[in-house]
Amino acid sequence: MVSPWLCAVWGEGASVTACLLSQILAGRGRTGLAALTSRYDGTPEPLLRALERLNCRSLVVALPETACALDRRADTAVLLSCGMGEAAEWLMRGCDRMVVNLDDPDGVPERDGPVPVWTISERRDEADLTARNLRLLPYRTEFEAVSGTDICRLSVPLPEGLGLYPGLAAAAAALSFGVTLEESARRLHRAEPVPVGMIPLPRCSPFAAAGYFDADGGAGV
C-alpha cells in the first residue's frame, strides 16, 4: 500500500494553516488532520496511523511550538516561524522539502537548507509565492497569489489580514503536492479556519483535534 503524503506544519498559526491545507487537499481525496495542542503527550504517530487505516490519501499534522517530533519523515514541512524550537529543528532535518516564511527573521537563512525550499512572503519578489493587492475584509482576507507567471486571487476565511500567511503557506504546501493555485482558490473559498465538517476520530485525545475531510463539498459531511 502506498503511504499517504505527509505535511507537518509548525509555528504561529500552525493549526489554522493545517486546517485550511487539509480542506484544499481533500479535493484530491480523503485527507486526515491532526492538530496538537501544547498539552498533547507523546508523538502524533498513533493519530496518523489511525487516519491511515481510514484510507486517507494525505495527512496534515500541526505541531505545537513545544517539543513534539514525528516518528516518520515528512514529505513537506511548513515553517511559519523558525526560531530554535526542537520541533522546528527536527522538521528541518526530517523532511523532503520545506515551505519557509521569508518575512520571519529566522526564515531567511533556511532557504539555503539541505532540501528544496519553497518560500512565501507578503512583499519579497524573490519568494516563490508572494501576495499583492491585499484586501482586508471584516470576515475574509483576499489577495492575489503570485508564483512566477501564475496569478490567482485567494479568499481566505480569516478577517482583517489574519488569513494572509496561513493562506500563502497552505497554497504553497498544496503546490508541492501538485495542486494548482486555481484549485486551491476554489477550495479556500469554501473552507473554514476551524475543522467544521471534519469527521473526528473516535476516542481521540482531548488535547488534539483529529479526523478527516472528504472530497465532496470541501469538508466531510
Question: Predicted segments — roles?
Answer:
Residues 213-220:
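Active-site glycine- and acidic-residue-rich loops that bind
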Residues 1-46:
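Walker A (P-loop) phosphate-binding motif
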Residues 18, 163, 217:
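Short, conserved glycine- and acidic-residue-centered signature motifs
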Residues 2-12, 41-42, 50-56, 62-212:
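Acidic, Mg2+-coordinating active-site environments of NTP-dependent enzymes
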